Amino acid sequence: MKLLKIIIIIFLALTIEINADTEKEIINNLQKGGNLIFIRHAYAPGNGDPENFDINNCETQRNLSQSGRLQSKKIGNFFKENDIPIKLVISSEWCRCKETALIAFKNYETENFLNSFYSAKFAKNRKMQMKKLKDLSLIHI
């Protein structure tokens, strides 16, 4: 439940105006550390990937737009400007996710268990993903 709240808070903090007291409270909680923050990826126009995409070839995938790159920079700046500790950044193998992580946080690792189960091609990963995410939250928080 804490993870879901943090995801929603980060999303709201980056996308809508909120009153100053609420924003300070959010930032204060994030500055304490010990949070698992999930960011899918910045803006990549469209939906899904082409049927014949290759996880190892960015040219076959839906990628960040210039707006998405700017959004990634803003995400990174939010964390830097507010001294929010980052212990570890992990990305899926999708190019749009890796690019978001690179622009926002510079250093990141990839893990295939974070790969989307959006398409039928990867739907079998869902149970494993949920288990590994739970394990990850227990280890790193």
Regions flagged by a language model, labelled:
Residues D21-K121, M130:
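Active-site-proximal alpha-helix that buttresses catalytic centers in soluble enzyme cores
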Residues I16-A20:
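Sec/Tat signal peptide C-region and signal peptidase I cleavage site
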